[in-house]
Amino acid sequence: MKNLKASEIRQKYIDFFVEKGHMVEPSAPLVPIDDDSLLWINSGVATLKKYFDGRETPRKPRIVNSQKAIRTNDIENVGFTARHHTFFEMLGNFSIGDYFKKEAIHFAWEFLTSENWMGMEPEKLYVTIHPEDSEAYRIWNDEIGLEESRIIRIEGNFWDIGEGPSGPNTEIFYDRGDEYGQDDPSEEMYPGGENERYLEVWNLVFSEFNHNKDNTYTPLPNKNIDTGMGLERMASVSQNVRTNYETDLFMPIINEVEKVADKKYLVNNEHDIAFKVIADHIRTIAFAIADGALPANEGRGYVLRRLLRRAVRFSQTLDINEPFMYKLVDIVAEIMEPYYPNVKEKADFIKRVIKSEEERFHETLQEGLAILNNLLAKAKSSNNEINGSDAFKLYDTYGFPIELTEELASQENISVDMATFEKEMDQQRTRAREARQSSQSMQIQSEVLKNITTESKFVGYETTDYQTTLTDLIYNGEKVESAEPGETVYFILKETPFYAVSGGQVADKGTVGNENFEIEVTEVTKAPNGQNLHQGVIQFGQVTINSDVDASVNRDERKDIQKNHSATHLLHAALKEVLGEHVNQAGSLVESERLRFDFSHFGPMTQDEIDQVERRVNEEIWRGISVNIQEMPINEAKQMGAMALFGEKYGDIVRVVNMAPFSIELCGGIHVDNTAEIGLFKIISESGTGAGVRRIEAFTGKSAFLHLEDIQNKFNSIKDQVKVKSDNQVFDKIVQLQEEEKNLHKQLEQRNKEITSLKMGNIEDQIEEINGFKVLATEVEVSNAKEIRQTMDDFKSKQQDAIIILASDLGEKVSLIATVPKEQTDKIKAGDIIKNMAPLVGGKGGGRPDMAQGGGTQPENISEALRFIKDYIKKL
């Protein structure tokens, strides 16, 4: 058999089937497009469902692909086995109603055994078939020439996922030889059994039946072929290595981790698990981010976060205690570049996302692990189970994935009370749902509304005033003929200029009435049957149904809403231009006073980025772009480059808001006629709403001017406060005052040092001999963490051969610092001293072997912590 690189196997596979008349289907993104049934693309056939179910017709009925895929149903096994992966490539050839069993089997045999392709030894190949698949048996036995002893009948060789296409399958196995086990049926040492000797390299599925609702099977009119060959597994066979992780797909990653950890792979089993976890997970994370996913607290983003945190946790067994996963991205990109160039193209962005996420997790990991260790100790002393409420707190407060808690607990033979955990999760979801609903004042989805079928036409795109008829009236949840002054009512108009809250845009306000009554409209939502449902308070007169009324939208508020909505589109485009195409809308609120825009991005924007975005939006406003709005088929809209919001559902006909060339979006909202009407755009804040999501709030027009006016007034007050007359003098004056403050602070520090020195007396008298070490462990009086470091420097200069441990009460906080002479760090480490000491004062810390720092929130425990650390050194 040929020894081939993984990239060579992939290319040979594609070339072989192209020669056999197959069309190459490019690998689709891991994030499914137009398929809500999948979290990730998880197989080679997943992207071809459009052909198998008849929605689309391929250019050729024969298809070949190499599809990247993610499966996360057994993450806990990754690292502990030879071939479990979360990210993998599936090579596949498919026939949509064209060839069937005969050709599929002959193609597979030729590719595997021909010297032009894989060159496998025929005598090392075995196959399994379904017991009743006599046709497959005949082809293997009579046509291929495989002797009966190498054709194994297995009942499980039938591909069936319930209702829909199904059929028998045949699997091809490669015999790796006696070194991987002696033949023994009692130990499943046979093709199809659980063993390391006979490896499945290819699965051919013959989709020839339809699984009916009544659990009967009928022949399909068009029979299909669906095959799958795992590239990682085939590479391990071709390269003659024991596991997939020793192939050229993983070893360059593992080699880099060896350098970082200063440890070798295949020396220590515990370390090997960590190497494999890291190598697997970084591939998944890099590819998923390249395809548009970002770490988050739910959905596919949560999967990424879980994988990254699992890898970080395992890296600690290799003594890697700092962010490093991001450094592996370039290696992944280089390995995969021949077929997947997008990872290299987006490498800088991927690294920034991963590094940001690593840093965030490292901040809470030590504290989370300390809490988990306490929970484990508590469980061991009671019922060997972690309380679900405690596990939820660990997840909710410290960002600890519940799966990580379960995994670490299982290693100690401790279970987690998942029923209580899920109950806590449900309560959290309920609270979130109720919070959302409480912000929506009109949630009356009663039978009354469902039974109202009166048509209502929205005319608000064309006008803000309209003469119409009040057709339906609701009071206290009931349809009524009339209502009285002061009552809050819901009503429907035959035609309405009032926009109903939708797409982030708030509803219009205004009045509805005639000479006999007036209703102040306070809210408008969509009724179950599509009408605009108005809410309002009767100002005067008796309201009766079927009355002719004047419906008038508050024009000033409407104009401000239009400005903010159009500015939101410009903001979205500017963010993509400045930050990158990964930016997608994650939510918005368009009001008359302001706009709020949530978007996907891995970290806080810099001030320069904020300034660039603000400038670009204003430039497009000042250009005076005509805003063209038209309805068209959705395919036509996409062809012209219209941006569809991720996760939104659109009909066949869509409304396109065109501010070309800068912004083209699908949108049902109300906009200005020309961007110049917006006047001015000013960002007032940029913040985070959750991992991977940022929020910008901004003003336009008059609100932006008033905001700038307020800033100017505050600046004038500062000018008066620092007693200067010119605007240009303010900065220099503040610098002068800061310099004076700095000098005064230095004088204060010097006085504090002198006081501390007087109180401490001769530090030689404070030093103790403990277990062969000279140790100074004491509390010092300082005013901040900087001063405790300066005090440490003073003590070190006088006692260079002593271990020095200082603690200070800073009010509600504790500051800790420790140093160890470098020549003693092979016996005791400063980082270990602080890690053991900090929890006693309610905190955490760490650092280098020769110097470490920490802190806490329980100054009353300082004396106890100092006594503890002396005992700790005594026991070394």
Swiss-Prot record:
Keywords: Aminoacyl-tRNA synthetase, ATP-binding, Cytoplasm, Ligase, Metal-binding, Nucleotide-binding, Protein biosynthesis, RNA-binding, tRNA-binding, Zinc. Binds 1 zinc ion per subunit. CDD domains: AlaRS_core (cd00673). Its EC number is 6.1.1.7. Zn(2+) binds at H565, H569, C667, H671. SUPFAM superfamilies: Class II aaRS and biotin synthetases (SSF55681), Putative anticodon-binding domain of alanyl-tRNA synthetase (AlaRS) (SSF101353), ThrRS/AlaRS common domain (SSF55186), Translation proteins (SSF50447). It is found in: Cytoplasm. It comes from the Bacteria. It catalyses: tRNA(Ala) + L-alanine + ATP = L-alanyl-tRNA(Ala) + AMP + diphosphate. GO terms for cellular component: cytosol. One of its GO terms (biological process) is alanyl-tRNA aminoacylation. One of its GO terms (molecular function) is catalytic activity, acting on a protein. Catalyzes the attachment of alanine to tRNA(Ala) in a two-step reaction: alanine is first activated by ATP to form Ala-AMP and then transferred to the acceptor end of tRNA(Ala). Also edits incorrectly charged Ser-tRNA(Ala) and Gly-tRNA(Ala) via its editing domain. HAMAP family: Ala_tRNA_synth_B (MF_00036_B). Consists of three domains; the N-terminal catalytic domain, the editing domain and the C-terminal C-Ala domain. The editing domain removes incorrectly charged amino acids, while the C-Ala domain, along with tRNA(Ala), serves as a bridge to cooperatively bring together the editing and aminoacylation centers thus stimulating deacylation of misacylated tRNAs. Belongs to the class-II aminoacyl-tRNA synthetase family. NCBIfam families: alaS. This is Alanine--tRNA ligase. It comes from Staphylococcus haemolyticus (strain JCSC1435). The gene is alaS.
